[in-house]
């Protein structure tokens, strides 16, 4: 039986690590829209499956999932390439708004966000965060990544 994709979009779901830590087995049958499948696999910890699924979606959303996969690899150069393929995505303003709210809860993270959401800025922030395990910066980056995931997954399910 396929999983109900709406369960994955809940804001209180598990948080993904900033760097992938291997693959897991799952019983997640592909669901529609196809662009959301890569995100579901990523949330479930199936990095390789998410990578394969993202490669098969030739849309800005597929490129976005592909970029997140490479950001978690971590391969900042490849992540940057895929984010450039995305261009300016409609979820960017919402991700920025959530990032601003999240960072208010983590004042010692000392992050000054750009005026507009910048995927490259977030790649760099994640790279810094993983070098500071247990820090407020790492916790904030994980929360921002989760907000980004929620916005992209919701967009894939119901593009405006």
Identify the residue ranges that each predicted region occupies.
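Alpha-helical protein-protein interaction scaffolds
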Residues: 60-70, 74, 82
């Amino acid at each position: 039986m396929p999983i109900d994709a709406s369960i994955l979009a809940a804001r209180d779901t598990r948080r993904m690590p900033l760097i992938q830590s291997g693959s897991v087995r799952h019983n997640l049958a592909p669901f529609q829209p196809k662009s959301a499948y890569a995100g579901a696999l990523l949330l479930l910890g199936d990095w390789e499956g998410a990578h394969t699924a993202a490669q098969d979606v030739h849309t800005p959303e597929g490129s976005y999932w592909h970029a997140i996969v490479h950001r978690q690899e971590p391969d900042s150069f490849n992540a940057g390439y895929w984010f450039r393929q995305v261009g300016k995505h409609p979820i960017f303003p919402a991700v920025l708004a959530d990032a601003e709210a999240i960072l208010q809860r983590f004042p010692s993270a000392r992050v000054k966000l750009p005026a507009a959401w910048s995927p490259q800025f977030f790649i760099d922030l994640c790279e810094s965060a993983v070098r500071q395990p247990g820090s407020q910066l790492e916790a904030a980056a994980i929360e921002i990544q989760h907000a980004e995931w929620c916005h992209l997954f919701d967009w894939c399910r119901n593009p405006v």
